[in-house]
Amino acid sequence: MKNIRYIDKKDVENLIENKISDDVIIFLSGPTSQKTPLSVLRTKDIIAVNGSAQYLLSNNIVPFIYVLTDVRFLHQRRDDFYKFSQRSRYTIVNVDVYEHASKEDKLYILQNCLVLRSFYRREKGGFIKKIKFNILRQIHKELLISVPLSKKGRLVGFCKDISLGYCSCHTIAFAAIQIAYSLKYARIICSGLDLTGSCSRFYDENKNPMPSELSRDLFKILPFFRFMHDNVKDINIYNLSDDTAISYDVIPFIKLQDISAEESKDMTRKKMQYRTSTDSYAN
């Protein structure tokens, strides 16, 4: 633990400086991700998670960030992790992935990935935990968290600055959203944020099937999204999924044409900026 270098403010600033689009698409594992056209994916920064990166890479789309928070993926699909990490521009893993990695993999992670700190191991409440996070909240205004007094209750939270850490909630989507928010994207657009039925993944897992635990944990997950909606007033987030467990009053639905329309505006603005710069050189 002492030798871990966690993601810091300079890392976040570097990521912000290297963005290539105003919006970001979080490309998740839900079946509806396949409905997002490649033409749209090619125009935006992409945050890929788990095995969803394979689909992007096979279509010559390089993820801006590859995110992994599931220890099982590193253990069961190690070669894929290395491939996805090496072919993405940046990789972010949480501290659990690092701590449960082999010595060789730990070295790779420290040299090639950014490590994300988690504020807690379990979402259980309690008096001591409440005091701890009340103090942290006073020190770090970017940490929004609500901790019940009873250990039977479950805390909920959201961190606006990943250099401090992140609030986990049994789905990598929530980690990716906190990353995207920290990088100050104009719009955060979720693709494949379904969480319905058995919460199956759209990509082939014949080699190393990893049972999804999302349907079992849904009652733990949904309050975090509601908390985000109620407390992160300036977040501009949308869902492309037309089959989702998350209410559209929490994360609004967005049509593909609305993304394309904004994309056209971006292209026009960039052309105008280019013309202005060339005119200034001419003068």
Curated annotation (Swiss-Prot):
Report the main location listed first in the record. cytoplasm
The listed locations are: Cytoplasm
EC assignment: 2.4.99.15
Molecular function terms from GO: transferase activity
What are the record keywords, sorted?
Answer: Cytoplasm, Lipopolysaccharide biosynthesis, Transferase
Pathway assignment:
Bacterial outer membrane biogenesis; LPS core biosynthesis; Bacterial outer membrane biogenesis; LOS core biosynthesis
* Gene Ontology CC terms: cytoplasm; plasma membrane
> Could you provide one GO biological process annotation from this protein's UniProt record?
lipopolysaccharide core region biosynthetic process
Q: Phenotype when inactivated?
A: Mutation of the gene results in changes in the LPS core but does not affect the attachment of O antigen in an E.coli strain producing the O antigen from S.dysenteriae.
Q: Which reaction does it catalyse?
A: an alpha-Kdo-(2->4)-alpha-Kdo-(2->6)-lipid IVA + CMP-3-deoxy-beta-D-manno-octulosonate = an alpha-Kdo-(2->4)-alpha-Kdo-(2->4)-alpha-Kdo-(2->6)-lipid IVA + CMP + H(+); alpha-Kdo-(2->4)-alpha-Kdo-(2->6)-lipid IVA (E. coli) + CMP-3-deoxy-beta-D-manno-octulosonate = alpha-Kdo-(2->4)-alpha-Kdo-(2->4)-alpha-Kdo-(2->6)-lipid IVA + CMP + H(+)
Superkingdom assignment = Bacteria
Q: What else is known?
A: KdoIII is found in only 10 to 15% of the LPS molecules on the cell surface of E.coli K12. Overexpression in an E.coli F470 isolate (with an R1 core, lacking the waaZ gene) leads to the formation of truncated LPS structures, lacking up to 3 hexoses from the outer core, and which contain a KdoIII residue not normally found in the R1 core.
Say what the protein does. Involved in the biosynthesis of the core oligosaccharide region of lipopolysaccharide (LPS). Required for the addition of 3-deoxy-D-manno-oct-2-ulosonic acid III (KdoIII) to the KdoII residue of the inner lipopolysaccharide core. May also play a role in a lipooligosaccharide (LOS) biosynthesis pathway.
NCBIfam families reported for this sequence: PRK09822.1, WaaZ_KDO_III
Q: What is this protein called?
A: Probable 3-deoxy-manno-octulosonic acid transferase
Protein species of origin? Escherichia coli (strain K12)
Protein encoded by which gene: waaZ
